[in-house]
């Protein structure tokens, strides 16, 4: 029986262990095997045949439960429309395997590791199973260092750890995906780093936008595909829950190869981790498990841990993971975001209030929690500047109610100065993105950490008190703000 060579790393499959479908419940199948030939949990099985309309079918599924009486329950990785009872199911004898290595860069894959970009087959030469153990404790690297992103608000107030796990928390439409796209762009251009993007249950349009954006910015080089810096793995909203549940593991497996074999520092982007949880919840219900808190699966902690514990730094290389986390109804106590919190080194919370003001990226400094913002890690100058910025913004927040009642004129001179500087800081935290040039009309800017610290120190010290606050909006470094102020003065 011919099967997909990219899914399993073999060109033909010997029918050693053949079962047949006994029941189909949406994306979940019950399969009977001969006595003594039960497949293992997580083994992949192939269903090939013709549907009632005479069309060829090729469905891969993964064993999830052993039911007894020589039956297993499996979850399909693609649509089950057209499958019928009594169809033959061939056990491959191994978990799902996907292509890994340089051949994956610049290409788009589905959960099975099949290329879906119409650019031909992938000559990877090597495949890896998507189910693996986390690196041994002795292999872990505990060294702390900052990962510069070129985004002012992130680098100053919520710095990322190299080899850490970072969560982007926010409701719908506050800019999580745009921030991820900018990070991929900056990391590829400034660091020459390799990235793997896992699109887990997000909109197909967003996946297409990301691909087009990566081509425009030359992160994916269509003319010379080997020079590309990112591999894309998609399991979008229209896919069955099995694919959405496993596509994160496919992306992670590709990233692990760059870390373990090529000994590189890799970036792994997952958008969106909540869709991974939701897919697990759908599968859990179909497998007959009793729901837990708020209807989520009882195995939520285990499923999250099996993904997150593999994302780590070793002495050979690192995986720095940035995960978008959709927060249902903006409720951070929901079990899905709450379970994710436990695994993260830093959280970047995106605020609807800031987005409404037009401050992009809409990162909320008061809600974001960086574990790396310690003087012995980032240095005294960075730490003190960040603390002073936070204190100024916090004081501004406290004064807003008083100003709303009495007006700014009734405030003390000191409070008026604090408000003026805080408003400049708030605007200076905005930044034009390379990937959002179409929307903002401003060319994107990469700002180094040194320039970022210098700019905020100048605002805090009062050197720029005479400049209008609008000069600080959507600029890169502080020199641009002063130039913008000078230009507007001439125009007026």
Swiss-Prot record:
PANTHER family: ATP SYNTHASE (PTHR15184), ATP SYNTHASE SUBUNIT BETA, MITOCHONDRIAL (PTHR15184:SF71)
Function: Produces ATP from ADP in the presence of a proton gradient across the membrane. The catalytic sites are hosted primarily by the beta subunits.
The family this protein is said to belong to: Belongs to the ATPase alpha/beta chains family.
One Pfam family cited in the UniProt record for this chain: ATP-synt_ab_N
Species the sequence originates in: Huperzia lucidula (Shining clubmoss)
Gene name of the encoded protein: atpB
Protein name per UniProt: ATP synthase subunit beta, chloroplastic
Matching HAMAP family: ATP_synth_beta_bact
Gene3D superfamilies, per database record: 2.40.10.170, Bovine Mitochondrial F1-atpase, Atp Synthase Beta Chain, Chain D, domain 3, P-loop containing nucleotide triphosphate hydrolases
């Amino acid at each position: 029986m011919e099967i997909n060579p990219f899914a399993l790393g073999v060109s033909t499959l010997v029918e050693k262990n053949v079962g047949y479908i006994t029941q189909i419940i949406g994306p979940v199948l019950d399969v009977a095997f001969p006595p003594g030939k039960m497949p293992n949990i997580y083994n992949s099985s192939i269903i090939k045949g013709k549907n009632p309309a005479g069309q060829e079918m090729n469905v891969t599924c993964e064993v999830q439960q052993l039911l007894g009486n020589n039956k297993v329950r499996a979850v399909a990785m693609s649509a089950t429309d057209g499958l019928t009872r009594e169809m033959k199911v061939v056990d491959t004898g191994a978990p799902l395997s996907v292509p890994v290595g340089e051949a994956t860069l610049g290409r788009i894959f589905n959960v099975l590791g099949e290329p879906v970009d119409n650019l031909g087959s992938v000559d990877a030469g090597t495949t890896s199973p998507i189910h693996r153990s986390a690196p041994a404790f002795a292999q872990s690297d505990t060294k702390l260092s900052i990962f510069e992103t070129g985004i002012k608000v992130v680098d100053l107030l919520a710095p990322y750890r190299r080899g850490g796990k970072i969560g982007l928390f926010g409701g719908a439409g506050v800019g999580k995906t745009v921030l991820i796209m900018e990070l991929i762009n900056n990391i590829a251009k400034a660091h020459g780093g390799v990235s793997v993007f896992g699109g887990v249950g997000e909109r197909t349009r967003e996946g297409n936008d990301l691909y087009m954006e990566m081509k425009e910015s030359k992160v994916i080089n269509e003319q010379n595909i080997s020079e590309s810096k990112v591999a894309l793995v998609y399991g979008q909203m229209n896919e069955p829950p099995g694919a959405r549940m496993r596509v994160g593991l496919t992306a992670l497996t590709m990233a692990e190869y760059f870390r373990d074999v090529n000994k590189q520092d890799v970036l792994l982007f997952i958008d969106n981790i909540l869709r991974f949880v939701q897919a697990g919840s759908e599968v859990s219900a179909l497998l007959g498990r009793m729901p837990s808190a708020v209807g989520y699966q009882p195995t939520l902690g285990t499923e999250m841990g099996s993904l997150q514990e593999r994302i780590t730094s070793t002495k050979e290389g690192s995986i720095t993971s940035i995960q978008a986390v959709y927060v249902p109804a903006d409720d951070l106590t929901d079990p899905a975001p709450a379970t994710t919190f436990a695994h993260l080194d830093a959280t970047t919370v995106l605020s609807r209030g800031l987005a409404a003001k037009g401050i992009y990226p809409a990162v909320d400094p008061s809600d974001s929690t960086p574990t790396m913002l310690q003087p012995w890690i980032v240095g005294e100058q960075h730490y003190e500047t960040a603390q002073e910025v936070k204190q100024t913004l916090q004081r501004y927040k406290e004064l807003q109610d008083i100003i709303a009642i009495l007006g700014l004129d009734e405030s003390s001179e000191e409070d008026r100065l604090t408000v003026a500087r805080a408003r400049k800081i708030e605007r200076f935290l905005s930044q034009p993105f390379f990937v959002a040039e179409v929307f903002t009309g401003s060319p994107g800017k990469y700002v180094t950490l040194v320039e970022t610290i210098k700019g905020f120190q100048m605002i805090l010290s009062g050197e720029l008190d005479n400049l209008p606050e609008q000069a600080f909006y959507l600029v890169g470094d502080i020199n641009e703000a002063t130039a913008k102020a000078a230009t507007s003065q001439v125009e007026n």
